[in-house]
Structures are given as structure tokens and as C-alpha cells.
Amino acid sequence: MFTLNMKDKTVLVTGGTRGIGLATGLSFGGAGAKVVLTYKWGSCDMDEIRRSFAELGAPEPLLVEADVSYADDTERLLDEIAKTSDGVDVFVSNVAFAQRTPELKDYKKRSFFKTLEYSTWPMVEYTQMIKERFGRYPSYVVAVSSDGDERHYPAYDFVAASKGVLETFARYLAVHLQDEGTRVNVVRFGMVKTESFEQMFGERFTDFLDEEGLGDQSFLEPGDCGKAILALCSGLLDAMTGQVITVDRGLAFQDNLLMRYQRWQER
């Protein structure tokens, strides 16, 4: 029987105090891992997060304020980790930030570069700096992506572009780190019920899903995402590297006009 025990592992999750990031941390913590969660100033309730870990019987997480776009913050973060760990075994690059772009006039080069700085480059820079600080790369690097570079979502242009670059870098990073024993993979999530989803697409989207006869079953819960990432780092999928996998309850395959028409006929 296979038992997942990660009590001797250190897991770093950026943007780890809410949504997918927090759910990922809780999944690893539940398996016994020492979890490090980063956040930006004022973006987390530390007591509530610690309580969530305690309820699972998980080790208390290390919460560190660190902006992924600042190398100085990253160095300070790794110094904090070094106080209790000899390295980072799993790195989950989860932070994403972008300006909404409803119209072409909203495209600004500076805003796009800022999106890359937050949503794409940290996967590369953190991996490099972890090696510099600890003398070894993580065993697993997982980047959180979305299907926005293959499907159109209104005002999602910059996010989609940054995720496309992220996925390309992940594939190449997997080749560069293969001889180091590091697996690099990307998880594309479908619609996830999080605050950031509502901020991007609006609160009424769930009303639309209800009218379409889809409802909550179309959404992933953050916990579904955390379990998928944990599975990639469990050792059972070590034959996979440089892969982009989709976790979306199969919605992308079914989401088309003919399926909408069929549901309309059945009303």
C-alpha cells in the first residue's frame, strides 16, 4: 500500500494565503510537509490560516511577506527558510497579476511587462535563486496556469499571454533541469471558485451558469486544485516532466454552442 508522507519535505507556495495557493499549502500540510506560504502586505489573516492547518493536524506553516517581483524579498524569504530547512523540495509558482484589458486601447506595454514580472518570471527566478541559496534545485517545480491562452475570456488578454509564456518556459526549464532530477510541470485549471475569479469576470457569472443549467458543478473548488498539485509531487507521477496538464472537470470539451443548444431544447 502506498502512503503519502511528506514530513521531511519543505514546500514553498507563492501567493499561498488564499484560493488555490492556500488550498495547495493545506494539501501538502495534510501530508505532513513543512509549508512556506508567501503573501503581500495586508493580504492574509494569519491566525485563520494557522487555524486551518491545525485543524488538519498539519505542521504550522511559515508565513512570509514577499513580493515575487523583488529579488531582495526573495533573498529574505530564502534566508527565513534556511533557518529551519536545508532546501526547498517543492516549489509551486502560483502568483498571477494582470490588468484587465476589455478593449485594445487598454493595451499598455508597461502593464504587460508588469504582468510578466508577476505571473511568469518568478517561476524561473525563484528556481534559480533556490539553487544559489541551497546548492540544489527543488525536486519538483509546478507552475499554475489556465486555459486562457487557448480559449477566449473577455478582458483576459494579458493573463492569457503571460500564461502562454509561462508554459513555454516550463517546458524548457524541464529540459535544463532533467539531469538535476527536477520535474517541472504546469497545471492548467479551469474555472475555480475564488475571489480573483469574481474580480476578473464579475459576481453575476454564477447566475449565468445557473440559467445555462450548469451551476456549481462547472467550478473547481480550490481544494481540487491543491490535490492535483500534490499528486504531481507525490512520486507516483515522476515519469512526467515538461508537461502541461488540464484539470477542469472536462468542461472545455463540452463548452460549445451545440451543447448550449441541447440544454436549451431540454428546458
Region spans (language model):
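Short C-terminal tail/terminal secondary-structure segment
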Residues: 2, 241-267
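Conserved glycine-rich cofactor-binding loop
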Residues: 17-19
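Conserved glycine-rich Rossmann-like NAD(P)H-binding loop of the short-chain dehydrogenase/reductase
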Residues: 31-48
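Conserved mid-core segment of classical short-chain dehydrogenase/reductases
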Residues: 75, 96-115, 132, 155-158, ...
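Catalytic loop of short-chain dehydrogenase/reductase
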Residues: 97, 115, 137-179, 191-192
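Catalytic Tyr-X3-Lys loop
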Residues: 105-124, 142, 166
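Alpha-helical segment proximal to the catalytic Tyr-Lys
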Residues: 132, 175-176, 238
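C-terminal helical subdomain
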Residues: 186, 204-250
